[in-house]
């Protein structure tokens, strides 16, 4: 819905700069105006997310915990180790700024995928209900695709580093055995080679793909560490 408002201002004009000699913009205080302009008092969502019943924050992320506490977020610590079925995000894509802002190289255009998995919860990890006054803050910071999320502000950057890799001369035999023992994996592998010429021409990309689709691939790489409990 668009409404109209009366906007008051001053006419702009281009005048020679006394510093550079080039043209510069100056608002003429002797030429006030009042104009009717469009006022866009609504918005169209470019993305949406279903609000979970709660989030789970592992206690290792103490900096995030401190910021949540400073903003009045209510949290409850788990009293014992347990296993919970939770929605887990995986970081699929993001961009990173080439220049710093407030001491951070911010991420943007973050995209995630979601799946239900059983996750290990340790005593002391934090359960954060969304049924509280700080719900807006929680959504803006704990949802990684949100513009000002903790992920986009680099608080979870350690998940972006793959710490375990393979040695090609060793993994060649392992990769062959994996394909022989997993027909579905082999079918997906052959289909990928058929559809992607650049993949077909790169032996390393092929071994890397097999590695990342095997039990040898570290599960925490690119896995967003804050879990969601669906309603």
Segments and roles (model prediction):
Residues 3-33, 114-127, 157, 162-165, ...:
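Hydrophobic transmembrane alpha-helix bundles
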Residues 33-36, 104-108, 163, 207:
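A short linear-motif detector with a strong N-terminal bias
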Residues 134-137, 142-231:
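Accessory, solvent-exposed terminal regions and/or long lumenal/extracellular loops of proteins
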């Amino acid at each position: 819905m668009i409404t109209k408002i009366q906007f008051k201002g001053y006419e702009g004009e281009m005048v020679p700069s006394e510093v550079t000699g080039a043209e510069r913009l100056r608002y003429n205080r002797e030429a006030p105006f009042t104009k009717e302009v469009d006022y866009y008092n609504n918005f169209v969502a470019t993305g949406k997310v279903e609000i979970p019943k709660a989030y789970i924050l592992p206690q290792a992320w103490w900096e995030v915990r401190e910021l949540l506490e400073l903003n009045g977020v209510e949290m409850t610590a788990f009293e014992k180790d347990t296993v919970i079925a939770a929605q887990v995000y995986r970081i699929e894509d993001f961009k990173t700024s080439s220049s710093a802002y407030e001491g951070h190289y911010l991420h943007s255009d973050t995209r995630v995928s979601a799946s239900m998995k059983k996750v290990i919860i340790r005593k002391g990890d934090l359960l954060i209900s969304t049924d509280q006054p700080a719900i807006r803050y929680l959504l803006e910071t704990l949802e990684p695709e949100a513009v000002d999320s903790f992920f986009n502000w680099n608080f979870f950057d350690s998940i972006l580093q793959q710490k375990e890799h393979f040695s090609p001369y060793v993994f060649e035999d392992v990769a062959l055995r994996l394909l022989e023992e997993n027909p579905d994996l082999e079918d997906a592998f052959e289909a990928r080679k058929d559809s992607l010429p650049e993949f077909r021409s790169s032996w390393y990309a092929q071994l890397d793909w097999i590695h990342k689709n095997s039990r040898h691939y570290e599960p925490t790489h690119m896995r967003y560490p804050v879990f969601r409990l669906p309603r």
